[in-house]
Structures are given as structure tokens and as C-alpha cells.
Amino acid sequence: MAAAVAELWETLKQAIVAYTGLSPAAFFTAVAAAAALYHVVSGIFAGPPPPPPPRPRDEPEAEPLPPPVQLGEVSEEELRQYDGSDPKKPLLMAIKGQIYDVTQSRMFYGPGGPYALFAGKDASRALAKMSFEPQDLTGDISGLGPFELDALQDWEYKFMGKYVKVGTVKKTVPVEDGAPSTSPETTETAAAAEPEKAPATEEKPREVSSEEVKEKEDAVAAAAPDEGAKES
């Protein structure tokens, strides 16, 4: 094999000398210089790169996000309306009773996102425990350990720095067993419905006329002589 390669190389050198009159070294140097010159010249006279392909007309452009709307104090039931199921409404989520607009992160908290279960809810307990269980999708953080509370604090700092606060979750006061759950308005209504008791009337003394007094005096005077006769 080596002998065949050496024989081929000798034949090539003889052909170069016979046809070009140059030595093999000079011939290959000239070929390399010609290739380099071609590369430089083609780079100078080459046209500009082609423009990028035009954007398809049927591809919709991303609409700008609407500005956050302040909701004030809302109930948990009202907060569920902003879970991303209605694309016309903002995407909201609450931590420790504070509601934030997370519309800009719809890919995470919107339908189909990894944290879609947290949208429209106060997910404080779930975030602290990094749980996706339904019973943890609540704002009740009682019984959490120090590490879980620290994790929840980190989430709150992240939301405060990235999202706009738009409201708070209305707190519900539980009714104790056996205690009446009447509101002040109900008490006032019941008091107004009771009939008013008429005050007891005092009997006024009957007025005695002068004729009645005179008749009594005459009767006493007539009875006086009879009593004197009985005594004698």
C-alpha cells in the first residue's frame, strides 16, 4: 500500500513539472494563494445578506396588557371569577389576604399553566407547603412550621416586587355554636316590629261638688240631737 502511494506521488510530481514547469512546492503554493485571493474578492463583491422572511399576516400580534384595575375589598367567591377562565378579565391571585394582578404571568398562572390551581384564590397555605392538594388552596396558615412560613414570606416578597396589588380578601367572622347569628340590622327590625306598650294610666280622684258636701253636713247635724237624747 505504501509503495503504491509513493509511486502515485512520484507520478504526480513528474506531471506537475511536465505541464507547468514548476516544482511541486511552488505549484501547491500558487494554488493556495489563488484560493485565498478568490475568497477575499468574493467577500468584497458579495451582496448583502437576504432580509428575514416576512411575518405571516394571519399570525396575530400580541395585544398590550390592560392596566391593573383596583378592586378594593372582595370576598373569596368574587375572587374566583378572576381565575383566568374569562380572558377578558384580569388574572388575580392572593397571598396572605393581599390580591395581586398576575396577568403578565398567564403562562404560569393561567389555564394550562403549572400554577393554574392558585389563580382566583388565596393560595397562601399551598405556596408555603408547595402543595397542590385541594385542602391546601386556602388562606389559612395556622399550624405551619417556621420553614414553611419563611417560604411563604419569600413568595410574598416576590409578588410585592413583581406584581401590582389590586385589593384585599374580605375576612369572614365565624359564628360560634349556640350563639345567635343575628346582625344589628335584624335586632333593630325586631325591636321596631314590637308593639309599643301604652303606659299605665293613673286614676284621678273624683271631684266632689258643693251640694254633696252640704247634704252630708245637714245629715250629720240632724243625727246629733238624737245621739244626745240617747245619752241622757
Swiss-Prot record:
SMART domains assigned: Cyt-b5 (SM01117)
Database matches in SUPFAM superfamilies: Cytochrome b5-like heme/steroid binding domain
Region described as Disordered: spans on this chain: 48-77, 172-232
Low complexity bias spans: 179-193
One Pfam family here: Cyt-b5
GO cellular component, one term: endoplasmic reticulum
Tissue expression remark: Expressed in leaf sheaths, leaf blades and panicles.
Ranges where the Cytochrome b5 heme-binding domain occurs: 71-170
Main location per the UniProt record: membrane
Subcellular location: Cell membrane
GO molecular function terms attached to this record: steroid binding
Residue spans of biased composition, Basic and acidic residues class: 194-219
Family membership: Belongs to the cytochrome b5 family. MAPR subfamily.
Main function: Binds multiple steroid compounds. May act as a coreceptor with SERL2 and enhance its endocytosis.
Domain-level remarks: The cytochrome b5 heme-binding domain lacks the conserved iron-binding His residues at positions 108 and 132.
PANTHER family found in the cross-reference section: MEMBRANE STEROID-BINDING PROTEIN 2, MEMBRANE-ASSOCIATED PROGESTERONE RECEPTOR COMPONENT-RELATED
Protein name: Membrane steroid-binding protein 1
Organism listed in the record: Oryza sativa subsp. japonica
Upper taxonomic lineage: Eukaryota, Viridiplantae, Streptophyta, Embryophyta, Tracheophyta
